[in-house]
């Protein structure tokens, strides 16, 4: 191992409000990068970023990574990856860490963003939702090596993750010997406890 991979800047953005006060996913991702660079303590770190990895969202952009690099005046345009459905999000982090540790890259941005609430508000408020048009392809599209689920799982649980999460929570609850209400309260505590960063 040549280098040690560490997180040097993070950001998370959540918006609420009326349609006009909400941003599209591209603007949210751009703002998250700006805040993460600021959080790093040295905004010049942007000149050492060699790649940007983004899980494909519900948006239509082909390559938000290159747009964000240009919009933030990165010295070099990083290699961009868009990972499609079926690739675990943790894999983006794992790949970046591995490449840093091998000395293949200096730094990576792992980025994601959605504007589903703005899309919902557009329906409620009867407004038209537009996205910035980005037609340039990323350097790499990453697809899952195999299907995420088998035919039996698809028939019983569907294609949405919610069924799988419920199944995992049921298994955890059973393993811990908890009653349903007891397990629900435990999960509620997880989500209502203050964040370590607060």
At which residue positions do the language-model features occur?
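Active-site pocket-shaping loop/turn-to-helix segments
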Residues: 12-34, 56, 79-91
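Phosphate/pyrophosphate-binding loops at sites that engage ATP/ADP/AMP, CoA/4′-phosphopantetheine
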Residues: 37-49
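Short glycine-rich phosphate-binding loop at a beta-alpha junction
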Residues: 49-55
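Condensing-enzyme catalytic core mediating Claisen C-C bond formation in acyl metabolism
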Residues: 1-26, 139-158, 169-170, 174-182, ...
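Conserved catalytic cysteine-centered active-site region
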Residues: 56-121, 125-150, 154, 158, ...
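Residues on a specific face of well-ordered alpha-helices
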Residues: 31, 94, 162, 166-170
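Conserved small/polar residues in nucleotide/adenosyl-binding loops
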Residues: 191-198
